[in-house]
Amino acid sequence: MITAPIRTTARDTQIFDLISKEAHRQEEGIELIASENFTSKQVMEAMGSVLTNKYAEGLPGKRYYGGCQVVDQVEQIAIDRLKKLFGAEWANVQPHSGAQANAAIMIACLNPGDSILGFDLSHGGHLSHGSPVNMSGKYFKAHFYGVEKESGLINMDIVEATALKVKPKMIICGASAYSRDWDYARFRKIADSVGAILLADISHPAGLIAKGLLNDPIPHCHIVSTTTHKTLRGPRGGVIMMGKDFENPFGLKTPKGETRMMSNVLDMGVFPGTQGGPLEHVIAAKAVAFQEALSTDYLQYAKQIQKNAQIMAEAFLKKGYDIISGGTDNHLMLIDLRSKNLTGKEAENALIRADITINKNMVPFDDKSPFVTSGMRVGTAAITSRGMVGDDMIRIVEMIDTVLMNQTKDSVIETVRKDVNNWMAQYPLYI
């Protein structure tokens, strides 16, 4: 029972000490996980605001709770900024994550047992694109396309042949570990040829796409989903967009007998289809991040992410590492470690000891389990947020190579760790 104002409650030192430790870990190490980034202070301030106290089921102006006059404005600002950032006609900013966004889209567009065609998880795809351990693979009949063994690239002729064979109701383009750009126009032609809805999941390269540095899915894909962290540098969350709203092709009607627009179908896929109340404090943080991404400074940041990745990839190649597809167009690269007689697990664990964070990752045609893997995934979004540039990428690769070639030498790894910590002190995260 609370007998005093909440503001006088004793501080939870157990949790806040751990938060402090995590802050030190982030500040002292080199963060190379491709799906991670560092938000601005104001993004975190929005997430830690009183908006977390407000329930707001429904949409702005159409809520099931009273007292939403302020959060209505917050959410509408987030929607408007997102539409401006990507040139979209419609957007929903409520999904709690990218996977939630994809689930909502599938619930809205598909029936149990319908066929979908996505990028193979073992080739760099994502769980939410049809993996059997995910709802997308449990409730729908999933088929996959992948990359060619020699080139490491997606062969669009094979994608087309597969689509014509399996006749999917939905085709998904997007990945979590594919370093090349996507031919959205060709995917749309394929989708149209089989009557499929085309979904682009741009969770990884969204920030680069928003600034015109990669192909734009908005004019070609029926629906676009993305997370709001990664290259967008916002809070952890998801959104759904459409370049143009259109009448749903599934025959769904309103109570008045009118054909429902896809915007309405997708809105209902989010709520009440897969979620209850939206997280308005996170939506506020999304709005802040979208405003940051609309700036000219962010354009320079996005360009530097891409440049850093290309310089880093070239440095790895010069060290004799095998990069799937031979390079990168975006912010990440997938490195096959078999030529170095290493597993992804060994690489990840060795680098952690030096305060360098990457993640083990399966490579195409991998013969090892997802818990071991033959590769590692590396990304440049987070280190670019710290202000690092091209020459720094070469130094990072030197450090990584030193650690991986000296896994059993604790003294060597300790020396690298100290160098990492001293170096990162020159790039403070939050001043």
Swiss-Prot record:
Its cofactor is pyridoxal 5'-phosphate. It comes from the Bacteria. The modification N6-(pyridoxal phosphate)lysine is found at K230. SUPFAM superfamilies: PLP-dependent transferases (SSF53383). It is an enzyme of class 2 (transferase). CDD domains: SHMT. PROSITE patterns: SHMT (PS00096). It is found in: Cytoplasm. Gene3D superfamilies: Aspartate Aminotransferase, domain 1, Type I PLP-dependent aspartate aminotransferase-like (Major domain). GO terms for biological process: glycine biosynthetic process from serine; tetrahydrofolate interconversion. Disulfide bonds: none annotated. The record marks H229 as: Plays an important role in substrate specificity. Pathway: One-carbon metabolism; tetrahydrofolate interconversion; Amino-acid biosynthesis; glycine biosynthesis; glycine from L-serine: step 1/1. Catalyzes the reversible interconversion of serine and glycine with tetrahydrofolate (THF) serving as the one-carbon carrier. This reaction serves as the major source of one-carbon groups required for the biosynthesis of purines, thymidylate, methionine, and other important biomolecules. Also exhibits THF-independent aldolase activity toward beta-hydroxyamino acids, producing glycine and aldehydes, via a retro-aldol mechanism. This is Serine hydroxymethyltransferase. It comes from Cytophaga hutchinsonii (strain ATCC 33406 / DSM 1761 / CIP 103989 / NBRC 15051 / NCIMB 9469 / D465). The gene is glyA.
